Amino acid sequence: MAKYDDIINGIFFDRYEAGATSVRFERKDLAAKAHQLKIAVPKNLGDIIYSYKYRKSLPQEIIKTAPEGFYWRIKNVGIAQHEFVLTQGSEF
């Protein structure tokens, strides 16, 4: 699953600006980032999103950008459209 971390980190940091409270991306961006990183494109791109929503924490590099008392989560915002959203509270 390290490839998922590489892809999601790339997506986040390509778009993140210090102080941002949300970072939008589209599902097709996952495939583009995998190609750019020379990683085999996962057959089910949705599994990348699902993994970070329900199975595992986001990579530490992303977690560290959240201010104290906040965490990042991935939210669906449309058909094949997603957003990292800074949320107050605890991830678990």
PLM region descriptions:
Residues 1-28, 33-34:
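Positively charged, polyanion-binding regions of nucleic-acid-associated proteins
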Residues 1-8, 37-43, 47-91:
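Charged low-complexity interaction tracts in eukaryotic proteins
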